[in-house]
Amino acid sequence: MRLYNFNLAPSLTLGCGSWGGNSISENVGPKHLINKKTVAKRAENMLWHKLPKSIYFRRGCLPIALEDLADRKRCLIVTDRYLFENGYVDDTVRILKKQGLEVEVFHEVAADPTLAVVRKCLSMANAFKPDVILALGGGSPMDAAKIMWVMYEHPEVQFEDLAMRFMDIRKRIYKFPKMGIKAMMVAVPTTSGTGSEVTPFAVVTDEVTGVKYPIADYELTPNIAIVDANLVMNMPKSLTAIGGIDAVTHALEAYVSVMANEYSDAQALQALKLLKENLPSSFLNGANDPKAREQVHNASCIAGIAFANAFLGVCHSMAHKLGAEFHLAHGLANALLISNVIRYNAADIPTKQTAFSQYDRPKGVERYAQIAKHLGLEATSDHEYVEKLVEWVDGLKSVLGIPVSIQAAGVDEADFLAKVDKLAEDAFDDQCTGANPRFPLISELKELLLHSYYGHAYHEVYEPEPQEIGESEAA
């Protein structure tokens, strides 16, 4: 049996203060009213809101923003082969050289960067000795650049230590080394979605063991983010769709996180509003609607700031494992899960209450309803607002051409069913799980994965209450 008292005020009669006793140990009299009980309240931790020192935005801001590097000597640009071979790096190199900087380019980053690639980039850095590292590209070049930055500044680090999980990023067992002694980090996104240019996160894969190391610490936050929408005007439609829904997921999870606060809320809501108004046109019209492209690019960054401080939830926990196991793009994996995650989190009676000092009761329904109202959706109750929010997300995915299920995305059924138990276990142990508004059971994560595989709407399944011996006979 589950008993919740989230909305009950303390009773004046059920027990007294320091004298002990309870309401049935003796008749309650006037003396008990004098002995006031002390009601324990949760103490809230100090919160924070961290972001890069400088964020430049608006189309064409790149040359002006790079003037911040005028006092630097050597810049190592980290990018991928496609951007390098198609001229996306040329303008940046030209601007930096005009300012008197020596420039070298590492362009061998691929999707899901590996330690081998990062070490190759590190060899170039150690020989060149840059005082600026500039990541140019999507999430993969930024991840590679951030990890290389750590290894360049602190060759003694062990990734097992850096990847150690924590409940509070400020109170981790392993203290992250101080960054920025040798070089500063500049991030220039050429895709709209990851928000990595403003976040303290990076992921690298050990190609030998297959282990993914998710690294999280505010020391990894870039010093400068340059959000120039001119760099995303010609993004292909598939990348626009996957990146856009990734940004939507970032904002949704940040808003309902147990660590959400007044500062991150505003950014999550604004990001969702911009995405609702502009993502469909950005996808359908591309460079023919430059304003929509720019607003989606800004929304991606704003959502990044929100989840950099409020963190994410079980949608990302499962997407990390699903994408890695079946080679699905991260944004696509999120898209295949987010609708059912909303349904799962919108529960007034969770199986297990999440543990965080400022999160004193389930707020999933209330918070999702607030999002729906902010987006202008219409309903008559909070639960109906949640349904309307899911309908909007599903409608957006349909416009973007995203498959309706994991199965429709091409994942083999037998292979998925053979691995779903391990996926659920690994997702439970993911760093993102702790900030989810509903603390999950592994069995619940498995059900979410199964429902999402077949494209079924998640619904709560309650186990029957255990019967007392003889109860069934009496019935």
Predicted regions located by residue number:
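C-terminal segments
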Residues: M1-H49
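ATP/NTP phosphate-donor binding region
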Residues: M46-V132, I406
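Carboxylate- and glycine-rich phosphate/diphosphate-binding segment that chelates Mg2+/Mn2+
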Residues: V198-A310
